[in-house]
C-alpha cells in the first residue's frame, strides 16, 4: 500500500481526504453470476422472488457487509451495465454525492437512461453531468426561479389545499372512507403548476382535470424497467419481457405529453423569457421545467405525501394532540400560517424529516467512479475502481442501526433539539439534508420547497382537524393511504 496516496482517493465518513485508510482494507464481497443470465436471475429476484428491500437485505446478510457486488435491474437490454457496487449504510453512502470523485451523467433513474424523446428530444438537466456548462445554466435557472417565487409558496399552497379538504370530507361522508392518494396527487400537481405558471389553475389549460394522470403515465413509461405491477393474472415472464427487457416507446404518451408541454409553455412566459436571456431556447427550458415539476417534484410528492399521512395517522391521538398544540399556538402567536410561525414548530419539522428518512421518495442512486476510490463503511475500507458503477439503496442506508437508535421505527421526535445533528444522515434529496443545492452538484434544486410543502401539509391538516384514522397498503410507488375518520377541530 506504499503508493496508495498516489493511486487512490480516500473517502471517509465525512468524505474528506486522508493519506491512508483508517480502517482495514477488505475485498468487496459478492459476484455477478454467469454473464447475461446472472443479471436476469438477479432481476427476477428483485421483482418477483424477493422484492427490492429483501433483495438488498438478503445480500447484505449473505456477505456480512454493507458494501457488496451484485447486478441490479433493469439489466439486459435496457441497461448496458447491470454490475454495481452496492452501498446500504450511512457512512459509505455520501460518496454518491461527491461529484469530484463520481459522475452522475445519464444516471438519473438508475443504471439506465430513458429516451430523450420523453423530453422533446433534449437531455434535460437531471441527466447532465456537473461538468457540463448547460447543467450550470439550467440548474442556476431552477434555483433563481425558486428564490424569486419564495414568497408565493404559502399563498399558492393554501389556495391549492382547500379543494383537497373539500374532496376528502365529501368522499368520507359519502363512502365512509376516503382514498387519499389521488386527492394528494391533485394537490401536488395544482400547487406546482400554479407556482411555475403564474398562478394559473391547470384545469383552465390544455390538460384540464387530467394533469396528474398524464404525468403518472409519462413517468410510468420511463420508470417501467424498475416497476413490477404485481398482477396475479399476468405471468412473471410476460411482464418481465414487456416492462423490463426493452424501453417502452414515447409514442404511447406523446399526445398527452404534448398537452402537458403546451399547458406549461403557454403559462410560464416570465420564466421562459429569463431562460432566453441566459441563452437557453424557450422549448428546451420548458421541457426542463416540465421535468422538474412533473418528474422531480410531483413524482417525489406522490410518494412523500401519502407516507407522511401514513406515519402520522398510525402514530395515533397522542402525537396528534402534541402537533395540534404546537401548530395552533405558533399560528396564533404569528397571526396566521407564516414562515416564521412554521419555523417555531420543531415537532412538525422532525416528523417531516423522519418520514423522509423512513420512506425516501427516490430509493436508488447510481454514479460512476471517475477514478480509483477507497471508501469506508463502519468496519472496513474498500477499493472501487475507475469506471465502476456505484449503486445506493437509500431505504437501508437511512435505517442504519449504527447511526439511528431503533432505526426501523418511526420516531416523531428523532430530529428535535440535539437530534438535529443526525440530519447529515438524511439523504432523500440526493445530498445531505444539512447541505444546500448548488449549480455544482446533483442535489435536488427543490429540496427546501419539498420539505416546506410537507410541513405545510401537516400544519394545514391540524389547523382543521384534531385527529384522524387511516389504513395503509402498498402501491407501485410508495404507500396506499385511506382515511377511515376525521375529527374536526374543537378549539
From Swiss-Prot:
Q: Where does heme b bind?
A: 104, 135, 139, 442, 444
**One MF term in GO for this entry?**
monooxygenase activity
Q: What processes does the entry annotate via GO biological process terms? A: defense response; fatty acid biosynthetic process; oxylipin biosynthetic process
The entry's (13S)-hydroperoxy-(9Z,11E,15Z)-octadecatrienoate-binding residues are: 296
This protein is called what?
Allene oxide synthase 3
Q: Please tell me in which tissues this protein is expressed.
A: Expressed in roots. Not detected in aerial tissues, including cotyledons, leaves, stems and flower buds.
Reaction(s) catalysed by this chain, per the record, are:
(13S)-hydroperoxy-(9Z,11E,15Z)-octadecatrienoate = (9Z,13S,15Z)-12,13-epoxyoctadeca-9,11,15-trienoate + H2O; (13S)-hydroperoxy-(9Z,11E)-octadecadienoate = (9Z,13S)-12,13-epoxyoctadeca-9,11-dienoate + H2O; (9Z,13S,15Z)-12,13-epoxyoctadeca-9,11,15-trienoate = (9S,13S,15Z)-12-oxophyto-10,15-dienoate
Q: Which organism is it from?
A: Solanum lycopersicum (Tomato)
EC number(s) from the headed UniProt entry: 4.2.1.92, 5.3.99.6
Cofactor entry? heme b
UniProt superkingdom = Eukaryota
Q: Which UniProt keywords apply?
A: Fatty acid biosynthesis, Fatty acid metabolism, Heme, Iron, Isomerase, Lipid biosynthesis, Lipid metabolism, Lyase, Metal-binding, Oxylipin biosynthesis, Plant defense
Which Pfam families did the record assign?
p450
Identify the stretch annotated as signal peptide in this record. none
Induction of synthesis: Not induced in wounded or jasmonate-treated leaves.
Q: Known InterPro entries for this protein?
A: Cyt_P450, Cyt_P450_sf
UniProt record similarity statement: Belongs to the cytochrome P450 family.
Task: Give residues annotated as binding (13S)-hydroperoxy-(9Z,11E)-octadecadienoate.
Answer: 296, 302
Job description of the protein: Cytochrome P450 metabolizing both 13- and 9-hydroperoxides of linoleic and linolenic acids, but with a marked preference for 9-hydroperoxy fatty acids. Catalyzes not only the synthesis of allene oxide, but also its hydrolysis and cyclization. The first step is the synthesis of (12Z)-9,10-epoxyoctadeca-10,12-dienoic acid (9,10-EOD) and the final products are (9R)-alpha-ketol and the racemic cis-10-oxo-11-phytoenoic acid.
